[in-house]
Amino acid sequence: MIIKPKTRGFICTTTHPVGCEANVLEQINITKAKGPVANGPKKVLVIGSSSGYGLSSRIAAAFGSGAATLGVFFEKPGTETKPGTAGWYNSAAFDKFAKQGGLYSKSLNCDAFSHEAKQKAIELIKQDLGQVDMVVYSLASPVRKLPDSGELIRSSLKPIGETYKSTAVDTNKDLIIETSVEPATEQEIEDTVTVMGGQDWELWINALAEAGVLTPDCKTVAYSYIGTELTWPIYWHGALGKAKMDLDRAAHALNDKLSATGGSANVAVLKSVVTQASSAIPVMPLYIAMVFKKMREEGLHEGCQEQINRMFHERLYRADGAAPAVDDANRLRLDDWELRDEIQQHCRDLWPTITTENLSELTDYREYKEEFLKLFGFGIESVDYDADVNPEVNFDVEQF
């Protein structure tokens, strides 16, 4: 079939398998160009490995460190008449290139929140790898099915305490608008912590530890975003921020456990990037368009892959073997470049001056739109979008 982009709200409802493969190859090449990771991991489990920072982590481990990788994700395969999700095609492409490079790659397409996913991952690790020396936790989901009761819990992107009003961009119409979001109820806050907090990360690490499939020096990392005062009301000071604070709680508990044998658990605070997850957050597209332009001008711009490669090389697996620099909450900070005073002051000054008319001139909004479509495999120069493509792509994945 011939596949063209169709967007609805903050998602693109179509995806292009050849475009997704081109994206993955680009990220692999960025990683290879950075050179090998000294003392890097060799057997890595990535929970949430099909897009965004999770996919970048799997690529960094495999193509930066020569690691065997097991990826866990929840994606839809394509059918004769309908493309699959971008994450399906990303994972298929990763698997293809990993195997071409002689690297072990297996994937589980399932609900990562379930007990079954954890058991299946443990079985595969025991059977094929023995133990893993790194576990990356990178799930971004609006819903969690509680593994014991089967109850569906939903997260909320809402402020706490008062209605949030701000300038934003309507990415469908390319218009600057005023947006307002009603505050979360106590129940919504609690539910957001249940879905996006640290509980499932703990369940994973505890299950893996009890099964004896973690090396004594295993490192685990989960991803967070803190941002700045421009995004705090909807993010860090909102319901999602409470969930990310719970991730910090889990990191401390897990670090106490793993450090006893020489392992570690950290939250890594990452920079804002164009992902399916960030595009759903009010204000983020406009903030990203502003901050990207300034960071590009300053030579500080990083995409998902560059950011994760820096985490591997300069934080977790330093060539000198030194412990990584952490903040006062034991977090790895990769948002340090974005948070530089001159970058943030520029955004604060620019924010009130943005109009529909000057949006493309004063920010990288056009680039934001291009990056967004690229997530789904569109707008890539090397791809012929008038060519017939097969939406059914199979690879080494177990589904349950």
UniProtKB/Swiss-Prot annotation:
Belongs to the TER reductase family. Its EC number is 1.3.1.9. Monomer. The keyword NAD applies. It comes from the Bacteria. NAD(+) binds at residues 48-53, 74-75, 111-112, 139-140, 244, 273-275. Involved in the final reduction of the elongation cycle of fatty acid synthesis (FAS II). Catalyzes the reduction of a carbon-carbon double bond in an enoyl moiety that is covalently linked to an acyl carrier protein (ACP). The keyword tRNA-binding does not apply. Pfam families: Eno-Rase_FAD_bd, Eno-Rase_NADH_b, Enoyl_reductase. One of its GO terms (biological process) is fatty acid biosynthetic process. HAMAP family: FabV_reductase (MF_01838). This is Enoyl-[acyl-carrier-protein] reductase [NADH]. Pathway: Lipid metabolism; fatty acid biosynthesis. The record marks E75 as: Plays an important role in discriminating NADH against NADPH. It comes from Shewanella loihica (strain ATCC BAA-1088 / PV-4). The active site is at Y235. Keywords: Fatty acid biosynthesis, Fatty acid metabolism, Lipid biosynthesis, Lipid metabolism, NAD, Oxidoreductase. Substrate binds at Y225. It catalyses: a 2,3-saturated acyl-[ACP] + NAD(+) = a (2E)-enoyl-[ACP] + NADH + H(+). It is an enzyme of class 1 (oxidoreductase). Gene3D superfamilies: NAD(P)-binding Rossmann-like Domain. The gene is fabV. InterPro entries: Eno_Rdtase_FAD-bd_dom, Enoyl-CoA_Rdtase_cat_dom, FabV-like_NADH_b, Trans-2-enoyl-CoA_reductase. One of its GO terms (molecular function) is NAD binding.
